[in-house]
Amino acid sequence: MQNISLRKATTDDAAFALHVTEACMRVYAERTWGTWNGLPDFDPATDMIVERDGCGIGMIGVDRRQEFWILERIYLLPAHQKQGIGSFLLQCLIEEAVSEQAVLRLTVLEVNPARRFYERHGFILTHTISPRHHMEWRKS
């Protein structure tokens, strides 16, 4: 996708990570637990910063374990959602998983409509342990 790039996250990205996490997840956290903890959903070891024209617009985190990969997060600031960027990032991850013969797993809060986004990309619901849906993508 034009003008979209990824760079490895660093500890210097913590404030940006908090901003993105809050913009993307606060409403769902409040609907689920009644409160927002104000902590960034961020791990520099697994996260990449999504940039458009060199400016941070989101982040994606993937824990690449030996037996499977976990998509920890794919967050885009609201102004950059619904433009195909998330689909582009997820499709790139799926292609990488195929080449590495990896299964992708994720969880999504029950109140988060992102479940439909993942289903459109071939993820299937494996089980639900409230308040999260557990989903998986594997090459068929």
Where are the predicted features?
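Conserved active-site alpha-helix within GNAT-family acetyltransferase domains
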Residues: 87, 111-131
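Conserved GNAT acetyl-CoA-binding A-motif
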Residues: 97-109
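Short, low-complexity, intrinsically disordered N-terminal peptides in bacterial proteins
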Residues: 1-5, 140
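Acetyl-CoA-dependent GNAT
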Residues: 4, 8-79, 89-96, 127-130
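Glycine-rich phosphate-binding loop
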Residues: 84
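Terminal substrate-recognition subdomain of acyl/acetyltransferases
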Residues: 131, 136-140
